[in-house]
A protein has these predicted regions:
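A short glycine-rich, Lys/Arg-flanked "PGG" loop and its adjoining helix->strand segment in the class I
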Residues: 112-124
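Conserved N-terminal segment of class I S-adenosyl-L-methionine
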Residues: 1-94, 98-102, 112-115, 130, ...
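Short alpha-helix
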Residues: 158-174
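Short, glycine-/aromatic-enriched active-site segment of Class I SAM-dependent methyltransferases
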Residues: 131-157, 168
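Short aromatic-enriched loop/helix-cap "lid" or pocket-rim segments at secondary-structure transitions
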Residues: 92, 139-144, 189-195
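A short His-aromatic
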Residues: 103-107
């Protein structure tokens, strides 16, 4: 599974997603908007979804295709697509039961348009699962402290979102918000920081150092984060398209 090589923040997002992605019979369609190297697309496919991952990065898509092959995720498909141009993909409109968008919207200047375009791709009653940096986070990466560019160069164009900001985006896209929650607390953030630091030496070394610590966030992260009143890294939105 590609998630074995991911940092703990990515694992946190998958745990959040998987609780909201019950096993499917193969009839459910899922769209991964800004899929990166395909970890969540593959994870959804292995849970029985017909999953389509979109990303502009050809290298990442090639990695995703190879990972899907290795994982025998036969219902995972990947297409090269700039998500800023999702409105041009009329073939995807009204097709998907679920759309996921994890840590992607903060890279897009016209976030309102992206939300509207995702909503167009959902079936009536379809669900959006979205994660993005929490505006109140304490940055793990110095690049997340700003200043932020006014052009889309692949990095973050804003620090993150508040719950009010996500609710406003839902309203403008015609989506009904169902819940807002958070993931990646203090323990997970510190392990992720260790992963980033050791990865500068070598990716395999980073994996060997960090892997023994992966058991701790599911056990202690929520308790420690509440006790310290520490801001979570990601804010998570669950919304649906009205029937």
């Amino acid at each position: 599974m590609p998630l074995l090589h991911a940092d703990t923040a990515v694992l946190d997002r998958w745990l959040w997603l998987s609780k909201r992605l019950p096993p499917a019979s193969g009839q459910k369609m899922l769209l991964d908007v800004g899929c990166g190297s395909g970890a969540f697309t593959i994870g959804a496919a292995l849970r029985g979804y017909n999953a389509l991952g979109l990303s502009w990065d050809e290298r990442n898509q090639n990695v995703a295709i190879e990972r899907a092959r290795m994982c025998n995720a036969k219902t995972a498909e990947f297409q090269i697509q700039d998500i800023r141009d999702l409105s041009k993909r009329e073939d995807l409109f009204g097709k998907f039961d679920v759309a996921i968008c994890c840590e992607a919207i903060e890279h897009i200047i016209d976030d309102e348009k992206l939300m509207r375009d995702i909503a167009k791709c959902l079936t009536p009653g379809g669900k959006l699962l979205l994660t993005t940096p929490n505006y109140h986070l304490k940055p793990i990466d110095p690049a997340h402290e700003g200043p932020f560019p006014t052009v889309e160069d692949g990095g973050h164009v804003r620090k993150g979102y508040t719950s009010e900001g996500l609710l406003r985006l839902c309203d403008e896209a015609g989506l009904k918000p169902e819940s807002i929650s958070y993931c990646t607390g203090f323990v997970s953030q510190k392990i992720t920081h260790l992963h980033f630091a050791t990865r500068k030496i070598h990716s395999i070394f980073a994996w060997l150092v960090v892997n023994p610590f992966r058991i701790f966030p599911p056990l202690f992260d929520d308790v420690v984060t509440r006790w310290l009143q520490y801001p979570h890294y990601s804010i998570c939105l669950e919304a649906s398209k009205p029937n």
